[in-house]
């Protein structure tokens, strides 16, 4: 691929321009909340940000398909899994012309999205870091503290590993924050491949097998060509209180002591579009959950070859609850799918397995399957005090009770398990059809 520009992607799929400048204080949030899931991506001006800012770039599954160049879930999952196993090639090129951004962190498209949040948050930045030969790219929220200071939320995964390695040697971790990229790069940065598998290689695989990158001006970290904003930073040993922040579940994540990021230099690439994401928005949920759906799909498929659909539900932040549709071959397949899903995505809390005649995107059909095909004394799986998600406020100690519901019908099920059929009508379709429509 020539570059990983967000602008080139938006020009390909189409977008709509918002004809006013938005305040960082809640106006950006209202625009996202009012328009998400409806229509094309939007391009707006935000006060204090030099470049046009895109929102709702991949707030629907259809937009994710376009970002990956596929037409449906299975093809998308296969591309993500294949890119993880066989990453693409990074082609190093000369650094493009970049303009210094004297506003520093204050020039990033950060905003205050919810009442009670700690300040202006940026949730669309990819943090790229290389240390002792291991490179990582992942998405982390930044709380803007001033022109040269921000707080970063780091969970104990791969960036945390690199950060701890640096701190054990008394060093700050050199990193690069990149904003405004093709959504496939964001999707790759939201995956969790094994430590040492560089997420930019996954992005290259998703974008056709190769991706052009250049070295950041100060630290020399790889940056995808076409990035709108680039900031070389140090993740320091200093810590400050970070939060509250409204996360994927639309609840206020608790306040923690988190590292301070110190700015070394910030740059913009003229003519590009940058990007902001609201915590808990459909775009946030899609980017977080879709790679985990691919992991669940692959894990369950290895155990049961006929997996028809996987869905991490939007109401659970695309994170805690899964619905999986399968075609059973043997009794017990439902429980096998439950255990495979929990192993593939340790943050899962509840899993419902249904037959392939149930639409996983229709909560009424899923509840119907539970009502008609589930018995708690034989179809329920409970795993007490297992590792949970820090996003779940009811799992304060990091442990949770996991529950799986096998809502599949018996293999010898008779007509009593079938839903009534009306020729020419599909359950879940539009309810308010009028004669003549």
Swiss-Prot record:
Keywords: Decarboxylase, Flavoprotein, FMN, Isoprene biosynthesis, Lyase, Manganese, Metal-binding. This is Anhydromevalonate phosphate decarboxylase. It catalyses: (2E)-3-methyl-5-phosphooxypent-2-enoate + H(+) = isopentenyl phosphate + CO2. Mn(2+) binds at residues 136, 199. It is an enzyme of class 4 (lyase). InterPro entries: UbiD, UbiD-like_C, UbiD-like_N, UbiD_Rift_dom. Its cofactor is prenylated FMN; Mn(2+). Its EC number is 4.1.1.126. GO terms for molecular function: carboxy-lyase activity; metal ion binding. The keyword Transferase does not apply. It holds the Pfam family UbiD_N.
């Amino acid at each position: 691929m020539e570059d990983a520009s967000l602008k080139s992607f938006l020009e390909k799929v189409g977008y709509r321009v918002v004809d006013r400048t938005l305040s960082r204080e809640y106006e950006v949030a209202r625009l996202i909340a009012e328009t998400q899931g409806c229509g094309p991506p939007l391009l707006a001006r935000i006060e204090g940000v030099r470049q046009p800012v895109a929102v709702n770039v991949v707030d629907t599954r259809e937009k994710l398909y376009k970002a990956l160049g596929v037409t449906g879930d299975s093809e998308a999952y296969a591309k993500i899994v294949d890119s993880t196993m066989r990453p693409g090639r990074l082609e190093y090129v000369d650094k493009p012309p970049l303009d210094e951004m004297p506003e520093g962190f204050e020039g990033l498209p950060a905003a205050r999205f919810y009442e009670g949040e700690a300040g202006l948050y940026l949730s669309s930045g990819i943090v790229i870091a290389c240390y002792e030969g291991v490179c990582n790219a992942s998405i982390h929220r930044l709380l803007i503290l001033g022109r040269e200071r921000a707080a970063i939320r780091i969970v104990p995964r791969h960036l945390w590993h690199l950060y701890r390695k640096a701190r054990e040697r008394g060093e700050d971790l050199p990193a690069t924050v990149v904003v405004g990229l093709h959504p496939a790069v964001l999707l790759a940065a939201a995956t969790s491949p094994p430590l040492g598998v560089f997420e930019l290689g996954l992005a290259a695989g998703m974008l056709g097998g190769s991706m052009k990158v250049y070295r950041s001006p100060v630290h020399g970290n790889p940056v995808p060509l076409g990035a709108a904003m680039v900031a070389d930073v140090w993740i320091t040993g200093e810590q400050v209180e970070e939060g509250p922040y409204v996360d994927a579940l639309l609840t206020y994540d608790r306040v923690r002591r988190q590292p301070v990021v110190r700015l070394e230099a910030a740059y913009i690439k003229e003519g590009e579009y940058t990007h902001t994401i609201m915590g808990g928005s459909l775009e946030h949920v899609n980017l977080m959950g879709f790679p985990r759906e691919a992991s669940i799909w692959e894990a369950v498929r290895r155990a049961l070859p006929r997996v028809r659909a996987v869905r991490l539900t939007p109401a659970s932040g695309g994170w805690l609850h899964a619905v999986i549709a399968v075609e059973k071959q043997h009794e017990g397949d439902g429980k096998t799918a439950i255990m495979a899903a929990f192993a593939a995505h340790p943050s899962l809390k509840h899993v419902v397995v249904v037959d392939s005649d149930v639409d996983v995107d229709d909560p009424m059909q899923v509840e119907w399957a539970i009502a008609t095909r589930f018995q708690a004394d034989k179809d329920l799986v409970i795993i007490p005090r297992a590792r949970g998600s820090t996003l779940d406020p009811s799992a304060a100690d990091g442990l949770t009770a996991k529950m799986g519901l096998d809502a599949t019908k018996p293999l010898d099920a008779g007509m009593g398990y079938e839903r009534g059929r009306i020729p020419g009508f599909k359950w879940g379709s539009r309810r308010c059809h009028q004669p003549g429509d």
